[in-house]
Swiss-Prot record:
Gene that encodes the chain: murJ
InterPro entries to which the protein is assigned, alphabetical: Lipid_II_flippase_MurJ/MviN, MurJ
NCBIfam families given in the database record: murJ_mviN (TIGR01695)
Protein family (similarity comment): Belongs to the MurJ/MviN family.
Identification of the protein by name: Probable lipid II flippase MurJ
Swiss-Prot/TrEMBL keywords: Cell inner membrane, Cell membrane, Cell shape, Cell wall biogenesis/degradation, Membrane, Peptidoglycan synthesis, Transmembrane, Transmembrane helix, Transport
Topology in membrane: Multi-pass membrane protein
Taxonomy, superkingdom: Bacteria
Residues forming coiled coils: none
Naturally occurring in which organism (per UniProt): Haemophilus influenzae (strain ATCC 51907 / DSM 11121 / KW20 / Rd)
Length: 510
């Protein structure tokens, strides 16, 4: 399901690139899309799940189903009330949101500059896209509940509906409107609604669809609140950094936001397919091991450490070849996927520079998802917050140092900040004797790196020059790209086998 969602996400971006390219309209829509997208990552893949799942695991561990159902109702009611207020305020105050995150456009609007129209259009689009916050909050809530009972497929499939809605509005509604970016914003709203409605039958089938109830002072809700407030910052530092990049990009040349977006989206494919998916799967297991520590603390600690180590090994296995593959195939991938309609060859070149810069931090972005779980499963949110503050402040400093590199400098700064974040998260776990990078995993990493280098060399040898790619028709580009990816997989897999990697190296309790 996750693979289907990511593939459709790429199809959606291909359609968007064809429709609005990388010009002013694209910058405005992608700006308006980034806010709910940030909130999706924050809630669906971030702070809420990190705070809610461990507490829910405690209620489920008690074996009292009625108490668990009552807890779910109180959380949904309290969360729903708060998010409703925030959503309404954001819709009414959308010009203020646009001014905050699009300061460059707002400055032009105040001074009748050339980008004044971007600020006005962004304010309008935010009114349409912000209700997505309300929908995605409940999607994240129900998805977290279903994940704890082993129904991972429901949450994995939900983003498919968002992608379908956006593709449909781009193909059928946009041609009927003067502003195609407005149709895309409507697609975000409809996608959120479909995701929300899709979850309801599964919650009912599981016997967990209960009446929401406001319970701000409830013991369980209070515990989640205390865990979530710092986690909101700690788990989403990379996303906050991207928002800060958006603010700075609004001062740069037209196209900067679009080039950064398309770069980020290509990077999101392996990050979402591997990093977030693995993180989502291991969090309930880690939380369970932590809860079970009262029965057999020594065994629980070992199980916790083994689960963490397995997650890190999987990130190495999938993330290292993904990073090297993207570095070699950055321009061919961008050209094959996006160069049509309003997306030109110069956009391919521009986006490839920021893609390679972002890609330098891919492994760190993925490791953050795993390492952060080592804290949140133990209900420790303070440490990631401290680390997050350091990483975010560092990102601001890196941005200043990278000013000469324009929008590419923003991507470089994000990669450097993510690497620092991942290192500090690991160091904290090691100091607390929660998780140490095992010797077997170190040997495994070396083998993975050697295999990935061999893979990258083989692909680099056979890949055609970019001018040759530009002259190919679409189907020939796809043929070459698929062939190179298959070649990469064969070389990578064969080299791993030659280096002695076997199935038992991939098991949790290796």
């Amino acid at each position: 399901m996750t693979l289907l969602s990511r593939v459709l996400g790429l199809v959606r971006d291909v359609v968007i690139a064809h429709l609005i390219g990388a010009g002013a309209a694209a910058d405005v829509f992608l700006f308006a899309n980034r806010i709910p997208n940030f909130l999706r990552r924050l809630f669906a893949e971030g702070a809420f799940s990190q705070a809610f799942v461990p507490v829910l695991a405690e209620y489920q561990q008690s074996g009292d189903m009625n108490k668990t159902r009552e807890f779910i109702g109180k959380v949904s009611g309290t969360l729903g009330g708060l998010v409703s207020i925030v959503t309404i305020l954001a819709m009414v105050g959308s010009p203020h949101v646009a001014a905050l995150f699009g300061m460059g456009w707002f400055t032009d609007w105040m001074n009748d500059g050339p980008d004044a129209h971007k600020f006005e259009q962004a304010s309008l689009l935010l009114k349409i896209t912000f209700p997505y916050l309300w929908f995605v909050t409940f999607v994240a809530f129900s998805g977290a509940v279903l994940n704890t009972i082993g129904k991972f497929g429901v949450m994995s499939f939900s983003p498919v509906l968002l992608n379908i809605a956006m593709i449909a509005t781009a193909l059928f509604l946009a041609p009927q409107m003067d502003n195609p970016d407005l149709a895309l914003a409507i697609g975000i709203f409809l996608g959120g609604l479909l995701q929300f409605l899709f979850q309801i039958p599964f919650m009912k089938q599981a016997g967990l669809l209960v009446k929401p109830k406001w319970a701000w002072r409830d013991e369980g809700v209070t515990k989640i609140r205390k865990l979530m407030i710092p986690a909101l910052f700690g788990v989403s530092v990379s996303q906050i950094n991207l928002l800060l990049d958006t603010v700075i990009a609004s001062f740069l040349m037209t196209g900067s936001i679009s080039w950064l977006y398309y770069s980020d989206r290509l990077l999101e494919f392996p990050l979402g397919l591997f990093g977030i998916a693995i993180s989502t799967v291991i969090l309930p297991t880690l939380a369970r091991h932590h809860v079970n520590r009262e029965g057999d603390s020594a065994k629980s600690a070992v199980d916790f450490r083994n689960t963490m180590d397995w997650g890190v090994r999987m990130i190495f296995l999938l993330g290292v070849p993904a990073a090297i593959g993207i570095a070699v195939l950055a321009q061919p991938m961008l050209l094959t996927l996006f160069m049509r309609g309003n997306f030109m060859l110069n956009d391919v070149y521009a986006a490839s520079y920021s893609l390679r810069a972002f890609n330098a931090g891919l492994l760190s972005f993925m490791l953050i998802k795993i390492l952060a779980n080592g804290y949140y499963a133990r209900q420790d949110t303070k440490t990631p917050v401290k680390i997050g503050i350091i990483a975010m402040v560092s990102n601001m400093g890196f941005n200043l140092l990278a000013i000469p590199f324009s929008y590419v400098g923003l991507a470089i700064a994000s990669a450097m900040s993510a690497t620092l974040n991942a290192y500090l998260l690991y160091r904290g776990l090691a100091k607390a004797d929660v998780y140490h990078f095992s010797r077997k995993s170190a040997v495994f990493f070396v083998k993975v790196l050697l295999a990935a280098i061999a893979m990258g060399a083989a692909v680099w040898y056979y890949v055609p020059e970019i001018n040759q790619w530009a002259k190919m028709d679409f189907f020939m580009r796809v043929y070459w790209l698929v062939w190179l990816i298959v070649l990469a997989a064969i070389v990578y897999g064969a080299t791993l086998i030659l280096l002695g990697v076997r199935k038992h190296h991939l098991l949790t309790k290796n």
